[in-house]
Every structure is written in C-alpha cells, then in structure tokens.
Curated annotation (Swiss-Prot):
SUPFAM superfamilies: Snake toxin-like (SSF57302). Pfam families: Toxin_cobra-type. Keywords: Disulfide bond, Secreted, Signal, Toxin. Its main location: secreted. This is Cardiotoxin homolog TA-ctx-like. GO terms for molecular function: toxin activity. It comes from Bungarus multicinctus (Many-banded krait).
C-alpha cells in the first residue's frame, strides 16, 4: 500500500511539473546572449525592437502578457518556448 501511495505521489509531481520555469534571453544588441529564469507565473518571452536615429535598439526578457503594439517604428514579438526570443 505504501508503494502504491509513493508511486502516485511521484506520478503526480511528474505530471504537474512543479519545478518548471521558463527561460528567456534577456540581453540587448550590445551584450552577448544571456538567459534568465522567469518567475513561475510568466508565460511569454519577448523581443522589443525599435529604430531610433537610424540605429536599431533591442530588448529581450520575460513578460506576463504579450502586448501586440506596433507604432513609431516599434515592434514587439512574443513567444512561449524556452529561449524563443533570439
């Protein structure tokens, strides 16, 4: 009986994947690609690029929501896989 209970607990933890956290790139164009572990409730990686004075500026990181804003030369890309915001 104890073996069955232990098996059920292990299967429950494996199915819920309690320890999973998303990783996203968090650099800009001037730094080498580095990653960050996102908070538990974060579902999106983002890449935000804009052109200012003829120079492309870019930011990457984790985001709770996925804003779909495209204005003033600004572009935001969101994705849900690990390190998908390269």
């Amino acid at each position: 009986m104890k073996t069955l209970l232990l098996t059920l607990v292990v299967l429950t933890i494996a199915c819920l994947d309690l320890g999973y956290t998303k990783t996203c790139f968090n650099d800009d164009l001037t730094n080498p690609k580095t990653t960050e572990l996102c908070r538990h409730s974060v579902y999106f990686c983002f890449k935000n690029s804009r052109i200012a004075g003829g120079v492309e500026r870019m930011q990457r990181g984790c985001s709770l929501t996925c804003p779909d804003i495209k204005y003033n030369g600004k572009y935001i890309y969101c994705c849900t896989r690990d390190n998908c915001n390269a």
